[in-house]
Amino acid sequence: MDKQWFPAAGILLAALLVVSASTLTLLSTNEDPEQFPSAPGTSAQQSSRILLGILTDVTGGINSVEREPEALGRRAGGLSTEGAGGQESPSMPGPSGRVIPEPIPSALTTSASDMASQPVSSGADPIEEIMALGTLETITMSSPQPSPRHESEQKFDKVFRLCGTVPASETLEKNVASKPAWHLIKAPPPPIFSRSPHLLWCTPNSTVYIPVPAWRDGHSRPEASSSVPLAPSTSLGLPIFPWMPNILKATESLLPASPGRSGLDLTSQVGSRASENTVALDTGPVSRGTSVLLLPSATSPSQASSLHSPRPSSASPLSASPSPAALSFFPSPASILVLVSSVTTGASDSPKAPVSVIAPSTTDSFIKTSNLGPQIALQPSHPGLWLPTSPIHMPTLSLQHFSSPPSTAHSSGFTESSVHADPTLASTLPHPGQDMSLQDLSFSTGGRSHTTHSVTFRINSNRFTKAVWNLVPLERWLLNRLICYQLRFIYQEAFPNFRNVSTLLFRPGCPEVKASLIFGPPDPSSIEILWTLYRKVKSSRWSLGYLSLADHGLSSAGYSMTDLTQEIINISFTLMRPFLPQLLLPSSQSCILLEKQTIQLVTHEVSRFYKAELQSQPLLLFSNVKEWVSVYMEYKFKSPIPIRLQGLASHLAHHITDPTLQKSSIMANGEKADLVFYEMWLLILGHPFTKTLENKTSSECQELRGLLTRQLTSVLQPLKNFGQVVVEEFHQEPLTARVQTAFFGAVPAQAIIQDTVLQALGSLQETEGLQLEMLLPVLGTPSSRASRGPRGGAMLNLQRFTSLFVLVALCTAPPFINKQALYLS
């Protein structure tokens, strides 16, 4: 009794499916043949074939129950012929010629096929499919574009199916803006891989958004979604993710199709440390605009599981449909990966698609990594670091590998190869000793109006070499983006004709990085490019972002730091103003303001001394020297100059009149100004000593120093060859001030200096109420003649007479008048 109604139920179900398929076929005939169905699964005509395949499976199941395979098989064959309009069923024949029914499709397959079979008008908006993830059996189909004349003659070239298992609690959304044609994917009935493989979607070269749930240790993250925009005009449309194995690219032309088989037969294996799953691609003719997108596995805890990227408002329609392809998974200990993609050039006579191949490595070779530019944010599946869910602009990497370097070698020891390598070269896997680079294909070829220059620098980090050798870890992605961003920022600010950073070349086991820069006309010189990077890196305390660089590893196209030092001058001096910690931050307001003032103060005099035009902005550094601001500057000129010309320090000391610049501290190209110093100690009576006077940054110290400096300068300035008065410091018990007076060349007689200073001290007592006594004058040696001894016994010992002068001053001083001293800020 339980089995008697099965034939009737099967017949009713078959009739219902045939009616639905016939209706959909009739509706699809009214559509424009040039339009592709918007569903990512199938077209309307292909949906009928899928339904007929499902019908065959259901009928086969009923046959096994009722033990009537022959009768029901003939009935199902008749229904298939009637519903498809004379077209063949996609069922696979067995060895004996008998149709072998496939396993009954899951609910996901049936629902996806039903949804994909709905007719879509040419002006309809992109639809959104929501498929619950259970035991996933994804079926996609593709056939040549239907022709209105020979529609009944169309057949499948190749069909296949990909089976995979993902958690049933997750949700997979696919938003497809264009209308591509899809391939039928079939897999061998017995799954022979040990764990769930990565889902492989064969998509046209358009913007496809595939939100994928993020898995971490078996826990789901429903909010994690992704969209992967595929670049429409790149030489290789293969996004590479951190969980993927080492992927190397060798550009090859497709082989001609063999008789009885359409397209190229490529069988290869893929493997890594974490997995020995293998992918074999069996493709037909690859059309333009086709790319392969690999999605992460749901069960691999060591692989990244989601991508994040904002969705654009619209997507461009497709220009070509993808070609059939076949996939199969099988394990193998030794593995290589073959990825097939096509080049989208936009021209009708575009070359054939390149083939990416990996093979075991046996020789030293050179690797390039291409930065294709889609916006991708990675989220690792392993415990620990989690990235924010907000999008991050990350490059899509593919590796380019060449077994032999070019004939020309660079001075830095790097070797470079063209983006389009010789297809006859054997590709090998990387190993220590190879060179590897990241390449941005948007400007990989400069063209006639562009030129390429290179710069090399060293990174002071032991972790750097370890991160670089792992070909596709997250650290490499972040490192690539950081370096490219910093270099673009530096050169875009200095050169309006700068275009892009095309290549980053890494040497495993070595901290050197070589960057290729693209410039438009006019072409800058290599020494200018080196100077620009040197100025920015040194002004940032030898850092590039958060990377610390070595101070001896910069070079550009054969020019090293030794060559650069031949064309620059350096100047250092001290500004007698309190040092602020903000001056160590180049972007702080205090640093920007002081930098502007200093450049205006010095640049004009430097240009006037050499009578030459300077190269852009100088290098400027601030540091702390005894609580004052120490300034270090470097200038480069646009034309060669006699940089060893002496006298620049004396020229600056004569012509810079800013009282805050300490003339005795000026040094240019290792040369000091030609000055002679007259030093004296002043005893300050009636003024209490406080600890704040020992701090040069305190307001009390600055007020008292300013008062003494102005008063002494006013009385000493009329003297011949007067240079500057500097109150160096204050000492306690008793309160004394050390004062240094600088003169250019010959110094006036000591008696004249003492008389002039005594006049200034009397004036201070009358105007400010300060009583000062000059303890001991000391005549020093010229700063530019340090080897010369003191003049004629003029150097006296201060320690011997200090107590005597203090005693005399205290005994002979008049009664102290309590009067508030007026301090000038």
From Swiss-Prot:
UniProt keyword annotations, A-Z: Signal
Region spans: Disordered: 66-97, 299-322
Superkingdom per UniProt: Eukaryota
UniProt key word Transcription: no
Annotated Low complexity bias: 302-322
Coiled-coil parts of chain: none
Signal peptide: 1-21
Expression tissues: Expression is restricted to circumvallate papillae.
Identification of the protein by name: Taste receptor cell protein 1
Organism the protein comes from: Mus musculus (Mouse)
